[in-house]
Each structure stands twice: as structure tokens, then as C-alpha cells.
């Protein structure tokens, strides 16, 4: 089993550092090199690879400096995104070997056209595609693409740990409760999250099991969710429900 450390960056980003028992590590979406280098130095890690989910600067800004410090590092990322530092472009269905574990690449377009996620060792590194209690904005892709991407991730085992790239859980839960104000699990979980954040603690990782209970974008088949957007849709297909939810969240 691999271990994962969170490296906070900027206002609410998480850079994920995956390591094994012999001090080798991989980092995911290093938007800033400085905290990564500090963590590597503190723990005497050796950086083997960088995994990138998409091309936004807060996910790749630290890559050039990390490559300068570790010239032999492998830079793995989406083949259909403008990321000049890649050494190993990957796409949906490809595999990446990390510490003798096979991580599969999932194409999850929506937030960006080429966005990917990485799943292995019961851990999902999903960038800005899936958040705890939310999902990424549609900067490049379509609502249907994002809906299908979320369904692809939701089909993974319930015990899968979800490592998203931002601490948005509290604000996402406020929206989730606007959608489902009578969801008792949501109400209880919000209290837990507010307590964690008040003490400066992270709410990530989540699990897919939890997300299926709290995330409105994964609950488009639920009667209460459908009812909440009934006035905003012409038909009640799950894609239409998702589209209405995403539009509502953009304005929330």
C-alpha cells in the first residue's frame, strides 16, 4: 500500500505526494515547486515522476523548476493538452507503473478537453474533474462530457479514495444542501467538515462511497435532486439534470 501526503499550495490547492517505503516519490499536479521541494528535502525523498491531470497553471506551474532540480524525472500527463514539459503523454486506458503498482489513466474531459485522472492502489487522483461534494467548472468541455466522466469515476469501487486538487468541500456542501435541504447525511457531514476546517484540517481524501451520498453531481438519478431542478429542465434525462445543476452551481 502506498502512502500519500498533502502539500498545500496557493489558497486552496493540494499537491499530492505519493511515496513508498524506500523514499522514492511521485507528485501530482505541482502548481508550485517551492512547497514540493521543501517536503522532498524534509523527508529526504527522491522524485521519480510527476503526474499531471490537466494544463491549468495552478497544476503545472512548478513543473519546470522540478525538472531543473531533477533532470531525470518522468513527466506524465494528458496527450491532448498543451503541456510542453511532458516526457510521457498518456490517454484513456493507458497504464503508468508507480512503485510496482499499475495506475490506469482515465480520460475525464469536461473541465478541460484533455483532462485525465489516475486510478491505482484504490486511490483516484482526479484533479479538477471530481471534487468532494462537487465537480469542476466546464471551461472547455460540454456538460455531457463531464456527466460521462463523473459516471466513469463513480463506477469505480466504493472504497476508492478520492484525491481531488482543491479544498472546496465546505462551499460545495452549501450548494449540495440547497439542492437537498432534507438530506440528513449531508447535514451531519457538513458539521464534521466545518469542524475540520475550523481547526485547519483537510477534508480530503474523500471516498466514492461518501461522494455518492453527498455529491449532487453524482446523484442525478435521485428523486429529490430531480425535483430540485424540475423547473429548470425541459426533460428529466440525467444529462439534463446534471446540466441544470452545473448551471445553478455556476451562479450560486
Curated annotation (Swiss-Prot):
InterPro entries in alphabetical order: Clx_II_MBL, Glyoxalase_II_hydrolase, HAGH_C, Hydroxyacylglutathione_Hdrlase, Metallo-B-lactamas, RibonucZ/Hydroxyglut_hydro
Gene Ontology terms, MF aspect: hydroxyacylglutathione hydrolase activity; metal ion binding
Catalysed transformations (reactions): an S-(2-hydroxyacyl)glutathione + H2O = a 2-hydroxy carboxylate + glutathione + H(+)
Enzyme class name: hydrolase
Top-level lineage group: Bacteria
Cofactor: Zn(2+)
Keyword Transmembrane found: no
Entry EC no(s): 3.1.2.6
Entry keyword set: Hydrolase, Metal-binding, Zinc
Residues bound to Zn(2+) 1: 54, 56, 111, 128
Listed PANTHER family: HYDROXYACYLGLUTATHIONE HYDROLASE (PTHR43705), HYDROXYACYLGLUTATHIONE HYDROLASE GLOB (PTHR43705:SF1)
Function: Thiolesterase that catalyzes the hydrolysis of S-D-lactoyl-glutathione to form glutathione and D-lactic acid.
NCBIfam families given in the database record: GSH_gloB
UniProt subunit comment: Monomer.
Family: Belongs to the metallo-beta-lactamase superfamily. Glyoxalase II family.
Name under which the protein is recorded: Hydroxyacylglutathione hydrolase
